[in-house]
Regions:
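Mid-to-C-terminal secondary-structure elements
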Residues: 125-141, 152-283
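N-terminal membrane-entry
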Residues: 282-298
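Intracellular coupling helices
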Residues: 6-18, 22, 305-322
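Short, strongly hydrophobic transmembrane alpha-helices
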Residues: 16-45
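The feature marks short, hydrophobic/small-residue-biased sequence motifs that occur predominantly
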Residues: 100-103, 110-143, 147-148
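Membrane-proximal extracellular/periplasmic loop immediately following the first transmembrane helix
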Residues: 37-108, 115, 222-225
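Residue-level signature of the transmembrane alpha-helical core
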Residues: 9, 24-28, 297-300
């Protein structure tokens, strides 16, 4: 019976090859575009190493600060280290909070006497290795004592290790990072650029550089972002409430100099953070979902029209019989 169905279908396709080819191609293209849109969304929110806990992440990449002397204006961008520690690292509800630089920076690495090559550098704290699950090939991440001491150690990817030392077994070996000597503490598997928060090729403690001095607005704004790891999604609301209380308490202190921090309902979960494109605007998740649904409907109309045309064509051929 099934073989007969395929035989009939093949015979009908051969009767009108042009219409059949156009209909099949149109349907296939529509399905391909739908899959593409879905995949583009999924890579932003679906968990995968080293961001396997995306469903428990809350992010604060940027914020705003205003001053009573600015006439309603605001400064927008990443926060300073002091702000990150006072407002987020002090939270009690989350499982962990990590502070890191707001973006990777292309930085030269080389061995003494050899030409340099550019890598993507991310500066972090020791909690970073608890929040994100990297696959270590050799060695281990830097710990709290190493971080607090500001020791020049680094975790590098396998590809960087092979580029510098021609082997992934590079623990304890030294290299120059932006002309400063660093020692390899660990080697991890290469990280996809789709892991937008954890991605890097070399990770070092931010206490080993001068990045925390790159600040403005009396050190309240700077170059730092943070990610909060909740124990479960059920804690999101409690974490946001605690973060808001800390903001209000901190604003009392800042108010002595006329400053006020503005969060715009941060911290954001993974979905909301993935569509945020500026510090001074809160993304509309519902509107973004509606736009995505409209795209799906439009793309589904194409195969629906194709199938209707095929059915109508077949009916015209059988009018005499009907």
């Amino acid at each position: 019976m099934i073989k007969q169905y395929f035989t009939q279908a093949w015979a009908q396709l051969r009767q009108q090859p042009l219409i059949s080819a156009v209909s099949i191609a149109g349907t296939a293209l529509a399905i391909f575009l739908i899959m593409l849109v879905v995949m583009m969304q999924q890579v932003k929110v679906a968990p995968f190493a080293p961001e396997s806990n995306r469903d428990r992440f809350l992010h604060v990449h940027y914020m705003s600060i205003t001053n009573k002397n600015w006439g309603g204006g605001s400064s927008n961008g990443p926060m300073g280290l002091k702000t990150a520690r006072e407002c987020f690292q002090s939270l009690k509800t989350p499982e962990a909070v990590t502070i890191y630089t707001c973006m990777v920076v292309s930085t030269p690495v080389n061995l003494p006497g050899q030409p340099g090559t550019g890598i993507d550098l991310l500066q972090t704290d020791d909690a970073f290795w608890h929040v994100f699950d990297f696959s270590f090939i050799a060695g281990k991440p830097y710990d709290r004592a190493t971080f607090d001491a500001g020791q020049p150690v680094a975790v590098i990817t396998e590809s960087v290790a092979r580029r510098l030392f021609q082997t992934s077994d590079a623990i304890g070996r030294e290299f120059l990072l932006n002309h400063a000597p660093y020692k390899v503490a660990g080697v991890v598997k290469d990280v996809s650029t789709l892991a937008t928060v954890a991605y890097g090729q070399v990770w070092v403690p931010y206490t080993s550089t001068e990045i925390t001095k790159d600040t403005w607005s009396d050190e309240h704004m700077g170059m730092m972002s943070c990610t909060i790891l909740a124990r479960s999604r059920d804690d999101f609301e409690a974490i946001r409430e605690e973060a808001e209380r800390r903001r209000q308490e901190y604003n009392v202190i800042l108010g002595e100099d006329g400053y006020e921090l503005i969060y715009r309902n941060r911290p954001y979960d993974q979905e909301k953070s993935s569509i945020a494109f500026s510090a001074n605007q809160e993304p509309d998740v519902e509107q973004h979902r509606r736009q995505r649904m409209i795209i799906f409907i439009i793309l589904l109309i194409v195969p629906a029209i194709n199938l209707s045309s095929m059915t109508q064509s077949r009916l015209r051929q059988r009018v005499a019989e009907i």
